[in-house]
């Protein structure tokens, strides 16, 4: 886990100023934070919350960030968290973002920190699970905030930590996610020059950071198709329209 964090820190150092170097003791700092990082991840994995319902998750994050002595804004975008670290050297304003919501999935693994949480989703009682790695994302960004705060004098510019709710999509007609964070002006004060998201990937070697300019990871959206049929007598099917047959061909 600490290798993932190291990758993020190295990436941040390169992004803010390729002339900057991480402090010589960052390796020791990583080792010290690793047990806490693992503990956080297991806590969030065991206590997942659905989109726009991340009340306990957001509070847990905000309460910890406040102990670091940095500016914390909570709640934002319903259940999200924003924190600001002003570095000791001049530089850009860069945001690091992690998503915090879980999915309506039943966890079926024999782990001591497996989720047993249930919630209502779509009018049904469902299991809730961090099946997309957001528990890791939260923990990595919290640890990054801790380490960058510890080396605040060496940080060039300002770092904005964004813990985004409802990344998987706000339920129903609710607002949420990145759009709501932007709408509330979280990228305007301070004026963020670049935002870097974070996502783990089982196909990427541990300790490796992949990045590129512009958009990188795909997005998904929802749409509904309504197929209208036409009834007819069973002996005269040609007089009707079978919506099942038509739907199967879409």
What spans do the regions from the language model cover?
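Histidine/acidic-residue-rich, glycine-tolerant segments that coordinate divalent metal ions
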Residues: 118-129, 135-136, 148, 153-249
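A generic structural signal for short
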Residues: 8, 15, 29, 49-50, ...
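Bacterial Sec-dependent N-terminal signal peptides
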Residues: 1-22
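Metal-dependent amide/peptide-bond hydrolase catalytic core
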Residues: 20, 67, 244-250
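General alpha-helical segment detector with a strong preference for membrane-spanning helices
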Residues: 6, 103-105, 138-139, 203, ...
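Acidic/His- and Gly-rich active-site-bordering loop/insert found
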Residues: 20-129, 139-156
């Amino acid at each position: 886990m600490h290798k993932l964090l190291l990758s993020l820190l190295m990436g941040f150092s390169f992004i803010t100023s390729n002339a900057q170097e991480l402090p010589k003791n960052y390796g020791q700092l990583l080792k010290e934070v690793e047990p806490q990082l693992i503990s956080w991840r297991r806590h969030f994995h065991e206590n997942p919350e659905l989109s726009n319902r991340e009340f306990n998750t957001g509070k847990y994050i905000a309460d910890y960030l406040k102990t670091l002595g940095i500016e914390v804004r909570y709640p934002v975008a319903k259940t999200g968290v924003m924190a600001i670290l002003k570095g000791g050297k001049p530089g850009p304003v860069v945001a690091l973002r992690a998503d915090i919501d879980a999915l309506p999935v039943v966890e079926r693994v024999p782990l001591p920190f497996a989720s047993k949480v249930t919630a209502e989703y779509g009018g049904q009682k469902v299991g809730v699970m961090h099946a997309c790695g957001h528990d890791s994302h939260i923990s990595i960004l919290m640890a990054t905030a801790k380490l960058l705060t510890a080396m605040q004098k060496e940080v060039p510019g300002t770092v904005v930590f964004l813990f985004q709710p409802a990344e998987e999509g706000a339920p129903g007609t609710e607002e949420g996610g990145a759009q709501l964070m932007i709408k509330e002006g979280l990228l305007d004060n301070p004026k963020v020059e670049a935002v870097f998201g974070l996502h783990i990937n089982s196909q990427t070697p541990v300790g490796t950071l992949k990045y590129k300019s512009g958009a990188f990871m795909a997005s998904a959206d929802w749409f509904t198709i309504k197929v209208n049929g036409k009834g007819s007598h069973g002996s005269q099917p040609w007089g009707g329209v079978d919506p099942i047959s038509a739907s199967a061909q879409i």
